[in-house]
Swiss-Prot record:
Catalyzes the hydrolysis of glutamine to glutamate and ammonia as part of the biosynthesis of pyridoxal 5'-phosphate. The resulting ammonia molecule is channeled to the active site of PdxS. It holds the Pfam family SNO. In the presence of PdxS, forms a dodecamer of heterodimers. Only shows activity in the heterodimer. Keywords: Glutamine amidotransferase, Hydrolase, Lyase, Pyridoxal phosphate. It comes from Streptomyces griseus subsp. griseus (strain JCM 4626 / CBS 651.72 / NBRC 13350 / KCC S-0626 / ISP 5235). The lineage of its organism: Bacteria, Bacillati, Actinomycetota, Actinomycetes, Kitasatosporales. Pathway: Cofactor biosynthesis; pyridoxal 5'-phosphate biosynthesis. InterPro entries: Class_I_gatase-like (IPR029062), PdxT/SNO (IPR002161), PdxT/SNO_CS (IPR021196). One of its GO terms (cellular component) is cytosol. This is Pyridoxal 5'-phosphate synthase subunit PdxT.
């Protein structure tokens, strides 16, 4: 891998464009990923926000679920925001019928924990590993983490709830940093991808 990592954004649903822009601003070569062969060509992957049940079903429908699981198990760096966080969880406290996860982070999440769409909000969040003060977190029907395993590091909390975690090469936030123009969380992820190679 060159100094410029190739990072994909799972492009089944969600704010793909915003993640592509954030990754490019953090000095990565960013590209959408829709098929298993595209997944095989990236050094790391962002799983964006969206609707977690729909994303899970689309990943199965498009033949992406097993390749995603295999790459994450093999150590590919992965970053999930909001619904992406849910997909990276080992367990969902309140899953919808037919909802599957990729796994990769030893955590239990609660879907839509911060409320409905009209209860969305922005908040300053101190994120471990991100310098320069708090990041502006956009919480849209956001999950929170109920509990983590011994290998999972809590890197941010808001209102007494876990909203960002890291486990080895996996990162997850319940908020959307890509919607704010502050790309420091993406820069942290790009550094994680670089460190693997």
């Amino acid at each position: 891998m060159s100094d410029t990592p190739v990072i994909g954004v799972l492009a089944l649903q969600g704010d793909v464009r915003e993640h592509l822009i954030a990754l490019a601003s953090a000095d990565a070569l960013a590209r959408p990923v829709r098929r298993p062969e595209e997944l095989a060509e990236v050094d790391g992957l962002v799983i964006p926000g969206g609707e977690s049940t729909t994303m899970s079903k689309l990943a199965v429908l498009f033949g992406m679920m097993e390749p995603l699981r295999e790459r994450v198990r093999a150590g590919m760096p992965v970053y999930g925001t909001c619904a992406g966080m849910i997909l990276l969880a080992e367990k969902i406290l309140d899953p919808r019928s037919g909802q599957e996860t990729v796994g990769g982070i030893d955590m239990i999440v609660r879907r839509n924990a911060f409320g409905r769409q009209n209860e969305s909000f922005e908040a300053a969040v101190e994120v471990g590993g991100v310098e320069g003060g708090p990041v502006d977190g956009v919480f849209i029907r956001a999950p929170w983490v109920e509990s983590v395993g011994a290998r999972t590091e809590v890197i941010a909390e808001h209102g007494g709830h876990i909203v960002a975690v890291r486990q080895e090469n996996a990162l997850a936030t319940s908020f959307h940093p890509e919607l704010t123009g502050d790309h420091r969380v993406h820069a942290l992820f790009v550094d994680m991808v670089r460190a693997v190679n």
